[in-house]
Amino acid sequence: MTSATRSQVLSLYMRVFRIARGWQSTLPQDTESERRYIVQEAQTLFRQNQQLTDHTSIKKCIDECEARIEIGLHYRNPYPRPLYLPIMGLATQKGRKLKAQQRMRKQAKPVYLQSHDEDS
């Protein structure tokens, strides 16, 4: 990781904590739990991706973080937006059709959910 990339990642990490510190929920009783969620989510995802060394995968994670920040601030919602599967995305198939479904699901996954598993 270059020093420029490292400083960009660290500034994003600190930006997330600054956002969490000043976060105001639309419902006042949920403010504290949403602040905790923002901090825990940032810690989890940054630790999960700290071993990355490939520049393109690091760039994807940076783009994901920036997208999550912008979406969260715009909608005033710290939780990831739901993922809608394409048509025929859940039908059970076998062989080539199954591979096509898996490819459709992967292509339909937005940039702000790349670090999340399909099961979670």
Swiss-Prot record:
PANTHER family reported for this sequence: LYR MOTIF-CONTAINING PROTEIN 1 (PTHR14273:SF0)
Region (Disordered): 101-120
Protein family membership: Belongs to the complex I LYR family.
Name under which the protein is recorded: LYR motif-containing protein 1
Origin superkingdom: Eukaryota
GO cellular-component term (any): mitochondrion
Residue spans crossing the bilayer: none
Cystine bridges: none
Stored InterPro entries: Complex1_LYR_dom, Complex1_LYR_LYRM1, LYRM1
